[in-house]
Regions:
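Helix-start (N-cap) detector for alpha-helical repeat units in TPR-like alpha-solenoids
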Residues: 29-34, 67-68, 101-102, 123, ...
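Conserved structural position within tetratricopeptide repeats
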Residues: 24, 60-61, 92-95, 148-151, ...
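Short Cys/His-rich micro-motifs in 6-15 aa windows
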Residues: 20-29
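Register position in tetratricopeptide repeats
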Residues: 45-46, 79, 96, 113-116, ...
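Alpha-helical adaptor scaffolds
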Residues: 34-45, 112-151, 157-158
Length: 248
């Protein structure tokens, strides 16, 4: 930890050994930032992405220079299908720390897949169009667009939510349930997903089994996603499939 006033390394004292500034508040803020980061890391490990996002944003509120927290937030956004938001966090991270920063690697790998990035960006634009169709009452058109969007960017959880919401409004509850079960595999404790599932269960009188009804193919797909990790400072966290490194 370095003094924010002069940049000198700090010891255990509440005062900077170089400039004499009281650094007690700085140390407290950085401690809280690291605490929220570690909690966010735990959430990310169990694919509670929305919970991880909330904690990582809190971490950055206390210390915007917390590079591991910002990089992990980018990974969480990527896992949620928000590649543009992920890239933004990594660019900010790189601007704060240009050397020895994993963000540089993430940016490079993402930019190498320009076609995929363009496809993701297009899917987000199409989502906004689908949302506009919903507001104008053109639900059938929105459904067609959202199905295509999910094919292009299967991690875009807000597209799953909007499609499920349309199905609920149209009283097509089993279709909504199917979409929401896919959403829960992206973000296991997402409050919107769980709220919509609860509504489906109330309307149908049937509970949703989120495990035993999975097909073998679905289970293998989920397990493959869970096994995708990377390591930094002896801690294991999720890694987007696009960023997997080949083993020797």
């Amino acid at each position: 930890m370095n003094c924010m006033n002069c940049g000198a390394p700090l010891g255990r004292s509440m005062y900077c050994p170089s400039c004499g500034k009281n650094v007690q508040q700085q140390k407290k803020a950085e401690h809280l930032s690291n605490l929220y980061y570690n909690q966010g890391l735990e959430k990310a490990q169990i694919r509670d992405l929305s919970g991880a996002e909330d904690l990582l944003l809190r971490s950055l509120k206390f210390n915007k220079l917390n590079i591991p927290a910002r990089n992990l937030l980018g990974l969480v956004y990527y896992e949620m299908g928000e590649a543009v938001s992920a890239l933004s966090e990594w660019i900010i991270s790189k601007n704060f720390q240009r050397k020895d920063n994993l963000a540089s690697d993430y940016i490079e790998r993402l930019q190498k897949e320009a076609n995929k990035l363009d496809s993701i960006n297009l899917s987000i634009k199409k989502f906004n169009e689908a949302l506009r169709c919903c507001r104008e009452g053109n639900e059938d058109v929105a459904v067609i667009q959202l199905k295509k969007i999910i094919q292009q960017n299967h991690r875009l959880i807000k597209a799953h939510h909007l499609l499920a919401l349309i199905y609920i409004h149209q009283e097509k509850y089993e279709k909504a349930r199917k979409i929401l079960k896919k959403a829960i595999r992206i973000d296991r404790t997402n409050s919107t997903t769980l709220r919509y599932l609860k509504e489906v269960e109330e309307k149908t009188g049937t509970a949703t089994n989120l495990d035993s009804r999975w097909t073998l193919r679905e289970r293998r797909h989920a397990e493959a996603e869970e096994s995708s990790t990377y390591q930094v400072d002896n801690e294991i966290i999720i890694q987007p499939p696009a960023f997997r490194e080949s083993s020797a």
